[in-house]
């Protein structure tokens, strides 16, 4: 298991603080999803629990390293949300049990809380007391994916460390090596997944990627035949909201193409289809189309029990009218 290249610098920065004996006992990492924060914390924890670290690296040979590699270290506590997808006050009670007992291996104890956004209000209040005066050689790693929803008092108890989406050029280089796909395909997968290299890799290797290519081919064909209802079976079959996003991305790209923003296209592997929309429809029509599709997506996700096929049939007929199909 290797650390992703964009995480090497954050890893070195954090481990150096432990080397200098200046590390805070609780680190709250604010990060977008899909860049591997859990792996970063695992590698830092492995270094902390290593019996014979070599500089910034763990030795990979000692008993501590072997236990970590087997995901079986008794002093490494990875807490995930309970059945209701929340951390309750019971979770905090269990954390307290772990940290106020002696280390099983005689070294550090590590608590990893995978998503602070899942903490209930009562759990946060209880956890604040735990963070205030933890036992010696107890380290906390917390992850927050929603910057704005972050609890201010919890922030004040921790050292905040921010991670960002890697530079597109670096992500693209990594993705091409990992997937052996063409440059345009990798770039498209990255941009559809908001720059996340891990989500892009998963997407480009999945059936959903093939579904996307087939969907666009069917969409192009339906325009040639002046019958948008041809795509109804594909759009209702599964992942309807994802396919609405694909339509909107494509229409946005067509507007970008009109303004010569070719370097910023999301679907750089669908130039022919983008040109078709850009050459044949005014931007006002494309904009109206996007708005109606977004409204359709809103109804689909917010009205319980709605007839999906009926709603999408209606939307396709509305779209034909907007596009002035004869």
UniProtKB/Swiss-Prot annotation:
Subunit and partners: DNA polymerase III contains a core (composed of alpha, epsilon and theta chains) that associates with a tau subunit. This core dimerizes to form the POLIII' complex. PolIII' associates with the gamma complex (composed of gamma, delta, delta', psi and chi chains) and with the beta chain to form the complete DNA polymerase III complex.
Biological process according to GO: DNA-templated DNA replication
Organism: Buchnera aphidicola subsp. Acyrthosiphon pisum (strain APS) (Acyrthosiphon pisum symbiotic bacterium)
Protein name: DNA polymerase III subunit delta'
EC identifiers of the protein: 2.7.7.7
SUPFAM superfamilies: P-loop containing nucleoside triphosphate hydrolases, post-AAA+ oligomerization domain-like
Task of the protein: DNA polymerase III is a complex, multichain enzyme responsible for most of the replicative synthesis in bacteria. This DNA polymerase also exhibits 3' to 5' exonuclease activity.
Alphabetized GO MF terms: DNA binding; DNA-directed DNA polymerase activity
InterPro entries: DNA_pol3_clamp-load_cplx_C, DNA_pol_III_delta_C, DNA_Rep/Repair_Clamp_Loader, HolB_lid-gammaproteobact, P-loop_NTPase
One GO cellular component term noted in the UniProt record for this chain: DNA polymerase III complex
Swiss-Prot/TrEMBL catalytic activity: DNA(n) + a 2'-deoxyribonucleoside 5'-triphosphate = DNA(n+1) + diphosphate
PANTHER family: DNA POLYMERASE III SUBUNIT DELTA, REPLICATION FACTOR C / DNA POLYMERASE III GAMMA-TAU SUBUNIT
Keywords from the UniProt entry: DNA replication, DNA-directed DNA polymerase, Nucleotidyltransferase, Transferase
């Amino acid at each position: 298991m290797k650390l992703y290249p964009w995480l090497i610098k954050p890893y070195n920065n954090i481990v150096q603080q432990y080397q200098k004996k200046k590390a805070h006992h609780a680190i709250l990492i604010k990060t977008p999803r899909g860049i591997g924060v859990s792996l970063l914390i695992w590698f830092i924890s492995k270094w902390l629990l290593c019996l014979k670290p070599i500089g910034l690296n763990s030795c990979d040979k000692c008993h501590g390293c072997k236990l970590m590699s087997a995901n079986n270290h008794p002093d490494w506590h990875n807490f995930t949300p309970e059945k209701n997808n929340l951390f309750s006050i019971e979770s905090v009670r269990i954390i307290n049990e772990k940290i106020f007992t002696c280390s099983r291996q005689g070294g550090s104890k590590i608590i990893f809380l995978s998503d602070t956004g899942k903490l209930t209000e009562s759990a946060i209040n209880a956890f604040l007391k735990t963070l205030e005066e933890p036992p010696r050689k107890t380290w906390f790693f917390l992850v927050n994916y929603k910057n704005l929803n972050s609890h201010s008092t919890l922030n004040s108890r921790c050292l905040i460390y921010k991670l960002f989406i890697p530079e597109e050029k670096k992500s693209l280089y990594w993705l091409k090596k990992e997937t052996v796909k063409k440059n345009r395909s990798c770039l498209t997968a990255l941009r559809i997944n908001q720059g996340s290299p891990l989500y892009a890799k998963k997407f480009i290797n999945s059936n959903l990627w093939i579904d996307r290519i087939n969907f666009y081919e069917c969409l192009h064909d339906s325009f040639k035949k002046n019958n948008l209802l041809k795509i109804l079976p594909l759009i209702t079959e599964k992942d309807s909201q994802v396919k609405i996003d694909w339509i909107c991305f494509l229409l946005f790209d067509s507007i970008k193409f009109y303004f010569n923003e070719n370097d910023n296209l999301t679907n750089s592997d669908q130039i022919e289809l983008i040109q078709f929309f850009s050459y044949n429809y005014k931007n006002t029509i494309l904009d109206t189309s996007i708005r109606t599709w977004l409204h359709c997506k809103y109804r689909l996700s917010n009205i319980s029990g709605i007839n999906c096929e009926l709603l999408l049939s209606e939307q396709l007929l509305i779209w034909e009218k907007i596009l002035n199909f004869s």
